[in-house]
Structures are given as structure tokens and as C-alpha cells.
């Protein structure tokens, strides 16, 4: 079966975000550069709908994933005299996850079974790129495997490619894969945003975000009452009453009470979820002690957060210009509403200081300033 006859791979896997564009770059010049590596089914420079001025980023979509890989393997790219940053486009759903837009080389692999060894992980994940380190986590006291591992690659694109694919099977078992974000990476993300000048977002204008002036989903912050690791544990990473994907109904990700690795429910809690017996993702000191004992959210330093005044793609669809890379209703990624993404407290801040992951008091933001 020829390429043209084969069924198309999902669009999300064929799409690249291109950041750091010159304001002179047009759809045509972007296309003429990136079509060197394959057939483009879509190519757009995102523009302000009123002024028509470039926002400094765009998207290209190839006909096949193989062509996307070829383009990424050809980095660095220079378009109209400016070095640009291509990354695999993050879906609307995944853009809500903490650290979705961070560049990291390590993944967390959860839900792996007792009989899974290092070679099983290597056999599966080496298809995505060169592996540097594999760590299967064990209990310090008993030596028993804790049900999760970390895999470090030599290139962030390997991680980006892995996390946009929803399902992974290692040693015959389904597992959950996400970016591994250490405390240091979160701190450096926060400080790097502070150093990037001002109140704009990733290509945004006046307090606007990654794509404009509204928030990712108007109507309230993404994490509901308690927020991501919020001190009250009232809301989950996924809404006011839900935990992450339904894990841990009553608390946030590492929240004070129950929740995602909280005391009684959630991912890795004593009752149910990955990694049971209180050891799961973030529980009992695992995954870099993400919950930090509860009370601290996942955000940045005191007044500055990872998402600032606007949001990831707030103004409309990646494509008001004709595609679906757009907002969701009911929750903003980095919105200006009163409840920040990090709940009452922050990961590296005083408890309850009101600036969370993209919270309301931000003066800096995700890729703030004009653009990269």
C-alpha cells in the first residue's frame, strides 16, 4: 500500500508548533522552509485577528509522522534569517497538564508491574530515541518495586513524541507516561519566565496568552477549588470535584487530604490507584516528593507563575483560521480569574500566596515578552 493509499495517522501526531518566528514570516515562507521535509497538509502563522500582526508562532502539519520525524531530525531550523523552535504540538486536552509545554528529557512511567525489568522498558522506549538512564524505583526499606520508573533520553523530542501518544504497553501491561518534572525544573521554569520581560505570554499581546486576549476557558480556573496541590485539597487537577482523570475525587494532585497521592484516595494512595500502599505518584516521597507534604501547589515563585495573565491558546482555535487546536469551556490554563492553577499555595512559595500555575497575580508568563 502506498503512502497516498494508507489511512492517515491522527492529525495531532503530524502537527508541529513552530515558535520564535520572525514577525516578517508569512504562511508562504514558513511553508517553503518546512516542505523540504515532506508534504504539508496545513501551514499557518498565527495572527492577531484585529491587527493581523504575527504573534510570533505558527503550526505546520505534515502528511505523515515520518515526515515530522524528518523535520525534527533536521534541527536547528532557520526561517527568514531567524532560528525557530519546532516542537510537537500539544493537544488541547494535554495542554492543561502541568508542565505540558516544558522542555524535558525525562519521563515518568507509572503502573508498571512487579515483573517488569529494565530491559522491558529499554526494549519499548528505545524506539523513540537514545536512552541515557532507566531507573525503576524501589522502596528503600523493603527493596520492593514501587510500580513506577523514570526514563531519561538524550533529546527532549523523544519525550514530546512519547507523551502525545495516549497508550503505551510495556511487558504486556498498559502504563501511564508523562513528563517527569523535578522541583528544580519547576523552579527554573518559574525563574526563566521572570527573566523574560513583562506581562505578555507566549506570543501574546497585552496580557494575552499564547494566542490572544481571552483565557483558555473563561469561567474559572482549571483546577477548581483546591487546585493542583492546593492546600485545602478541595478540588482536583481536573475540576472542582474530580481528581486527575477521576483518580481521587476529593483532593488535588498531592493535596492536603485525599487526592492524587493524598491520604485516602487517588493515584498511589492507600486505597486505590497506581502504586497502592501509599506509595504512588508523589506519595511517601516518590516522584521527587511532588506534594511536598500537601499545602504547596505546583506553581512558581511568589508573584510570578507559569502561565500568567492569559492562556495557552485562548483566543480561539488554533485556527480561528480553521483547525481545532483551541480552548475548552470551563477552566482556564493560566487565567486571570481569582483562583490560580496552583490553588491556595505554591510549590516554591509561601503557602496561600495566591499565585499558582498561571494564577491571577502573575507579572510574567509562559514564554512572556514578545516571543521566544
UniProtKB/Swiss-Prot annotation:
Positions bearing the Glycyl lysine isopeptide (Lys-Gly) (interchain with G-Cter in SUMO) cross-link: 113
Subcellular location: Nucleus; Cytoplasm
Official protein name in the record: Heterogeneous nuclear ribonucleoprotein A1
Region described as Globular A domain: spans on this chain: 4-94
Chain residue ranges for the region called Nuclear targeting sequence (M9): 320-357
Ranges of compositional bias, category Gly residues: 197-216, 328-346
Effect of residue 225 to A: Abolishes interaction with HOXB-AS3 peptide
Single GO MF annotation: RNA binding
Amino acid at each position: 500500500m502506498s503512502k497516498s493509499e494508507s489511512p492517515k495517522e491522527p492529525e495531532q501526531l503530524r502537527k508541529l508548533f513552530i515558535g520564535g518566528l520572525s514577525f516578517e514570516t508569512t504562511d508562504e515562507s514558513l511553508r517553503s522552509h518546512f516542505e523540504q521535509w515532506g508534504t504539508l497538509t496545513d501551514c499557518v502563522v498565527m495572527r492577531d485577528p484585529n491587527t493581523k500582526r504575527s504573534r510570533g508562532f505558527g503550526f505546520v502539519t505534515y502528511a505523515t509522522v515520518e515526515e515530522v520525524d524528518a523535520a525534527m531530525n533536521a534541527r536547528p531550523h532557520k526561517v527568514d534569517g531567524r532560528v525557530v523552535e519546532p516542537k510537537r504540538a500539544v493537544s488541547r486536552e494535554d495542554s492543561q497538564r502541568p508542565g505540558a509545554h516544558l522542555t524535558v528529557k525525562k519521563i515518568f512511567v507509572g503502573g508498571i508491574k512487579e515483573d517488569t525489568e529494565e530491559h522491558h522498558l529499554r526494549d519499548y522506549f528505545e524506539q523513540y530515541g537514545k536512552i541515557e538512564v532507566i531507573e525503576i524505583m524501589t522502596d528503600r526499606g523493603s527493596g520492593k518495586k514501587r510500580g513506577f520508573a523514570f526514563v531519561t533520553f538524550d533529546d527532549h523530542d523523544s519525550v514530546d513524541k512519547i507523551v502525545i501518544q495516549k497508550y503505551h504497553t510495556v511487558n504486556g501491561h498498559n502504563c501511564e507516561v508523562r513528563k517527569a518534572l523535578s522541583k528544580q525544573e519547576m523552579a527554573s521554569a518559574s525563574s526563566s519566565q521572570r527573566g523574560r520581560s513583562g506581562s505578555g505570554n507566549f506570543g501574546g499581546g497585552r496580557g494575552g496568552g499564547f494566542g490572544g486576549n481571552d483565557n483558555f476557558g473563561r469561567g474559572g480556573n482549571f483546577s477548581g477549588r483546591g487546585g493542583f496541590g492546593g492546600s485545602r485539597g478541595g478540588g482536583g487537577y481536573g475540576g472542582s470535584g474530580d481528581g486527575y482523570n477521576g483518580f481521587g475525587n476529593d483532593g488535588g494532585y498531592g493535596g492536603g487530604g485525599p487526592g492524587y497521592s493524598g491520604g485516602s484516595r487517588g493515584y498511589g494512595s492507600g486505597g486505590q490507584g497506581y502504586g497502592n500502599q501509599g506509595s504512588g505518584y508523589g506519595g511517601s516521597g516518590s516522584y521527587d516528593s511532588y506534594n511536598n507534604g500537601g499545602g504547596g501547589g505546583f506553581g512558581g515563585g511568589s508573584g510570578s507563575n507559569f502561565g500568567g495573565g492569559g492562556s495557552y491558546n485562548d483566543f480561539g482555535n488554533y485556527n480561528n483560521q480553521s483547525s481545532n487546536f483551541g480552548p475548552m469551556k470551563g477552566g482556564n490554563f493560566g487565567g486571570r480569574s481569582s483562583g490560580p492553577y496552583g490553588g491556595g499555595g505554591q510549590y516554591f512559595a509561601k503557602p496561600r500566596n495566591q499565585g499558582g500555575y498561571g494564577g491571577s497575580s502573575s507579572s510574567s508568563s509562559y514564554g512572556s515578552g514578545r516571543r521566544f
